Curated annotation (Swiss-Prot):
Pfam families cross-referenced by the UniProt entry: Globin
Protein name: Hemoglobin subunit alpha-1
Biological source species: Varecia variegata (Black-and-white ruffed lemur)
Entry GO MF terms: haptoglobin binding; heme binding; iron ion binding; organic acid binding; oxygen binding; oxygen carrier activity; peroxidase activity
Domain Globin residues, every copy: 1-141
Chain sites annotated for binding O2: 58
Protein task: Involved in oxygen transport from the lung to the various peripheral tissues.
Expression tissues: Red blood cells.
Any one annotated GO CC term: blood microparticle
InterPro entries: Globin, Globin-like_sf, Globin/Proto, Hemoglobin_a-typ, Hemoglobin_oxygen_transport, Hemoglobin_pi
Binding site for heme b: 87
The keyword Lipoprotein is annotated on this UniProt entry: no
Record bears the keyword Iron: yes
PROSITE patterns xrefs: GLOBIN
């Protein structure tokens, strides 16, 4: 459960990320594909080379979904319902992949925003990404 302090930390961090969210999303995807090669199996139709347009486009989709979650932090299940349906019923993404991407997002954000990435912000973002992952996997049951 995100505390009021966690919610403030997440919102502040996301504001600091600002217009770079899409770039960071793409970098996190690349990082995930390189660090966890089995995750590539969900993207057989993508050009997975560094800087590909498809990775950039999907990175922006990831970032936009996270921005939506931040903007609806008190109702993430409602805000992410359609995305949860998509990943559970159509794409059938293994839930462990959300944890892997969350880790790669944390690493990417920490590398680009070291001043903002305090231990408290790190913990809050980790809890936030876990909450988003829980929502996205909620319809698997």
């Amino acid at each position: 459960v995100l505390s009021p302090a966690d919610k403030n930390n997440v919102k502040s961090a996301w504001n600091a990320i600002g217009s770079h969210a899409g770039e960071h999303g793409a970098e996190a995807l690349e990082r995930m594909f390189l660090s966890f090669p089995p995750t590539k199996t969900y993207f057989p139709h993508f050009d997975l080379s560094h800087g590909s347009a498809q990775i950039k486009t999907h990175g922006k989709k990831v970032a936009d979904a996270l921005t939506n979650a931040v903007n609806h932090i008190d109702d993430m299940p409602g805000a992410l319902s359609a995305l949860s349906d998509l990943h559970a019923h159509k794409l059938r993404v293994d839930p462990v992949n959300f944890k892997l991407l969350s880790h790669c997002l944390l690493v990417t954000l920490a590398s680009h925003h070291p001043a903002e990435f305090t231990p408290a912000v790190h913990a809050s973002l980790d809890k936030f990404f876990a909450a988003v992952s829980t929502v996205l996997t909620s319809k698997y049951r």
